[in-house]
Amino acid sequence: MKKNLTNIYLIGLMGAGKTSVGSQLAKLTKRILYDSDKEIEKRTGADIAWIFEMEGEAGFRRREREMIEALCKLDNIILATGGGVVLDEKNRQQISETGVVIYLTASIDTQLKRIGQKGEMRRPLFIKNNSKEKLQQLNEIRKPLYQAMADLVYPTDDLNPRQLATQILVDIKQTYSDL
């Protein structure tokens, strides 16, 4: 089946640069950027931490699956996904079939620095006292799933979001001439 190339999906762990790069991709392509976690918060009127607290991870993942399904039906979007989106097989399938999947990677130290700068220590799966260990654990579980989905992979440790977004677009156009 031919891949639908109208959407660009950014996957990777928290702090990998998905939203920063996505914002630049949206500007360069004049497309709308969606952040799946922010869209869930808008729809529910509650933040992700509250959803995790009240509904548990299973409740959040159900909401995430519904949001991914809705967003994958849109055309010509940039989507910065939540780090755990790859844990659900249906999410992986929908994302893979409806766009180009960009996997952004970063070292654990870079992720910790970025998460700390954004004041995002409140993330539900981010345990402040064991943050480095938690990120390593999440990476071990999710990395094979990210790699299996990825059409293109980019390290973001030395991130200049605009330069990286420009390179991603060049690479997409070289790889997929009909985008």
Swiss-Prot record:
It comes from Coxiella burnetii (strain RSA 493 / Nine Mile phase I). The gene is aroK. It catalyses: shikimate + ATP = 3-phosphoshikimate + ADP + H(+). CDD domains: SK. Pathway: Metabolic intermediate biosynthesis; chorismate biosynthesis; chorismate from D-erythrose 4-phosphate and phosphoenolpyruvate: step 5/7. Catalyzes the specific phosphorylation of the 3-hydroxyl group of shikimic acid using ATP as a cosubstrate. Pfam families: SKI. This is Shikimate kinase. ATP binds at residues 15-20, 123.
